[in-house]
């Protein structure tokens, strides 16, 4: 039985990446050591991390005046690290189109009780269960604000921002955790991008931060571990980084570049792959996708429901027994969610659609 992993993260990794990691696990390139055990100061790892950065820069067309940092703590740590480094003494706006954006705003509010800055909720679609990306009047944004924070892809609700909003000249900070490398963005449109690895980059445990150099604050932070400047100047080696996770990420970057053909080709594949499932849901009067506007639909996370919660539960149980794993929707929204990140096979979407048709026929 073929197993398809629809998990929202940690997610499917490319098979060639896993095979290469397996082949090199005990003896990395005749070093006599595994990457799991080699020093982060060794010449072997120095090449790994530099190659990882170079390939990511090429894939995303990252300009020279941006630093790339590999950090620990997941994207959730960035909810604190961003305002701590960028917003002291200023306003910071938050566009909340999903649960993770709300968490970022909530953490900012919590931090504002400790350091002087003002987090402002710019707009939210929480009142409609985040079924769309909220709009706002850019003239309401103070042009002296530190940044506008947004989440480019909402894993739970299945929405995405593809065209960046007008922010009245205020720099944009983006949580790009769940659609980085799956859609093309112009890095120069952002002051800072951060992304947890466990969707489209690699295993959980490493977070990529891409930050424009003029946003590296000279003021000492509460902790050196939370200071972008210190981390950037140390080349991501201020302390021992998650070496193996960075190594796997490098292999994924190589896969996107050499086997897929780059981000534009990857984005094309994602649009086609997710479109198969969206088209079927649209053609069905049994399944529903809750996203209000088709232009907001995610190419990575596709939530859907049947006519009842009982049928949802039955669907999840039967799907799991057939190898469609982790397809249950997030507890906050229910239903089902098919997360089809970059490494998820197209055949898995086709097989899921076949099962959905069969389930619909048997349960109408």
Swiss-Prot record:
It catalyses: O-phospho-L-serine + 2-oxoglutarate = 3-phosphooxypyruvate + L-glutamate; 4-(phosphooxy)-L-threonine + 2-oxoglutarate = (R)-3-hydroxy-2-oxo-4-phosphooxybutanoate + L-glutamate. One of its GO terms (cellular component) is cytoplasm. The modification N6-(pyridoxal phosphate)lysine is found at residue 199. Its cofactor is pyridoxal 5'-phosphate. One of its GO terms (biological process) is pyridoxine biosynthetic process. Pfam families: Aminotran_5. One of its GO terms (molecular function) is pyridoxal phosphate binding. Transmembrane segments: none annotated. Its EC number is 2.6.1.52. It is found in: Cytoplasm. Signal peptide: none annotated. SUPFAM superfamilies: PLP-dependent transferases (SSF53383). Binds 1 pyridoxal phosphate per subunit. InterPro entries: Aminotrans_V_dom (IPR000192), Pser_aminoTfrase (IPR022278), PyrdxlP-dep_Trfase (IPR015424), PyrdxlP-dep_Trfase_major (IPR015421), PyrdxlP-dep_Trfase_small (IPR015422). Keywords: Amino-acid biosynthesis, Aminotransferase, Cytoplasm, Pyridoxal phosphate, Pyridoxine biosynthesis, Serine biosynthesis, Transferase. Coiled coil: none annotated. Pyridoxal 5'-phosphate binds at residues 75-76, 100, 155, 175, 198, 239-240. Pathway: Amino-acid biosynthesis; L-serine biosynthesis; L-serine from 3-phospho-D-glycerate: step 2/3. It comes from the Bacteria. Homodimer. Belongs to the class-V pyridoxal-phosphate-dependent aminotransferase family. SerC subfamily. Catalyzes the reversible conversion of 3-phosphohydroxypyruvate to phosphoserine and of 3-hydroxy-2-oxo-4-phosphonooxybutanoate to phosphohydroxythreonine. PANTHER family: PHOSPHOSERINE AMINOTRANSFERASE. This is Phosphoserine aminotransferase. The lineage of its organism: Bacteria, Bacillati, Bacillota, Bacilli, Lactobacillales.
């Amino acid at each position: 039985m073929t197993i398809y992993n629809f998990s929202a993260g940690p997610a499917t990794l490319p098979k060639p990446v896993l095979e290469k990691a397996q082949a090199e696990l005990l003896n990395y390139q005749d070093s006599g050591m595994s990457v799991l055990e080699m020093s982060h100061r060794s010449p072997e790892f120095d090449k790994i991390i530099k190659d990882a950065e170079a390939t990511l820069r090429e894939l995303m067309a990252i300009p020279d005046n941006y630093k790339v940092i590999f950090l620990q703590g997941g994207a959730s740590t960035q909810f604190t690290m961003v305002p701590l480094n960028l917003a002291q003494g200023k306003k910071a706006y938050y566009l909340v189109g999903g649960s993770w954006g709300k968490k970022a705003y909530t953490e900012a509010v919590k931090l504002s009780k400790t350091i002087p800055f003002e987090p402002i909720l710019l707009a939210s679609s929480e009142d409609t269960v985040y079924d769309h990306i909220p709009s706002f009047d850019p003239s309401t944004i103070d042009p002296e604000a530190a940044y506008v924070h947004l989440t480019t892809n909402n894993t739970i609700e299945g929405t995405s921002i593809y065209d960046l909003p007008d922010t009245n000249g205020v720099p944009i900070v983006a949580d790009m955790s769940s659609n980085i490398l799956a859609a093309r963005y112009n890095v120069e449109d952002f002051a800072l991008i951060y992304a947890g690895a466990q969707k489209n980059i690699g295993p959980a445990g490493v977070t990529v931060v891409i930050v424009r150099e003029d946003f590296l604050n000279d003021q000492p932070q509460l902790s050196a571990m939370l200071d972008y400047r210190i981390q950037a100047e140390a080349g991501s080696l201020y302390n021992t980084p998650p070496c193996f996770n960075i190594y796997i990420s490098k292999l994924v970057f190589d896969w996107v570049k050499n086997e897929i053909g780059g981000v534009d080709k990857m984005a094309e594949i994602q649009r086609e792959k997710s479109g198969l499932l969206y088209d079927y849901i649209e053609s069905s009067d049994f399944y529903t996708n809750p996203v209000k506007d088709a232009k907001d639909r995610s190419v990575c996370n596709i939530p859907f429901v049947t006519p009842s919660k009982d049928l949802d539960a039955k669907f999840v149980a039967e799907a799991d027994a057939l190898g469609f794993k982790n397809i249950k929707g997030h507890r906050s929204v229910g239903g089902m969610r098919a997360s089809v990140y970059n490494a998820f096979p197209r055949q898995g979407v086709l097989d899921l659609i076949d099962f959905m048709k069969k389930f619909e026929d048997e349960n109408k």
